[in-house]
């Protein structure tokens, strides 16, 4: 009987608020059975907060000369995989061909990821998405089809994109 082993890497995107705590949790729990070199922490940058739909900068209520910032968000993961060299390293050192993303707010989709990767491979897709139903008012992003209001009676072209929860009406 022959056995094969494979290296399954895991990248965790952290924020300045969660990075040290995430690293401590991994170390205190011996990386939950993973090898330390399997786990890559990627620290996302902070960006300016917007106060409204007109993209006004949000100012600190205690200091009008200080702009409020927040972690860049889920979309930063692609830039971080590139800028940190993580995707290139995985491809060159481990032969990684597919990267699956799941968010802490979408863990129920995790079980569907192997099937989704299989479909992407079979159909030769460059990308595939898995989504789960959302309820109005949930503080989590969603895939949404955005269609402009019909002002002139003409058929409007829509756009399917990931939308942050604070941009959706309940």
Q: How should these model regions be labeled?
A:
Residues 1-170:
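Domain-scale recognition of functional cores that engage charged ligands
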């Amino acid at each position: 009987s022959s056995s094969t082993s494979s290296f399954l890497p895991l990248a965790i995107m952290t924020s300045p608020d969660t990075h040290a705590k995430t690293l401590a949790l991994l170390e205190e729990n011996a990386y939950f059975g993973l090898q330390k070199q399997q786990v890559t922490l990627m620290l996302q940058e902070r960006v300016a907060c917007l106060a409204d739909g007109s993209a006004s900068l949000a100012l600190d209520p205690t200091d009008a000369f200080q702009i409020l910032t927040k972690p860049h968000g889920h979309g930063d993961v692609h830039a971080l995989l590139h800028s940190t060299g993580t995707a290139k390293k995985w491809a060159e050192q481990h032969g990684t061909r597919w990267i699956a993303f799941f968010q802490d707010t979408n863990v129920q989709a995790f079980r569907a990821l192997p099937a989704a990767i299989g479909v992407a491979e079979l159909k030769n897709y460059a990308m595939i998405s898995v989504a789960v139903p959302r309820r109005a008012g949930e503080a989590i992003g969603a895939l949404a089809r955005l269609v402009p209001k019909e002002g002139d009676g003409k058929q409007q072209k829509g756009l399917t994109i990931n939308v942050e929860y604070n941009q959706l009406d309940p």
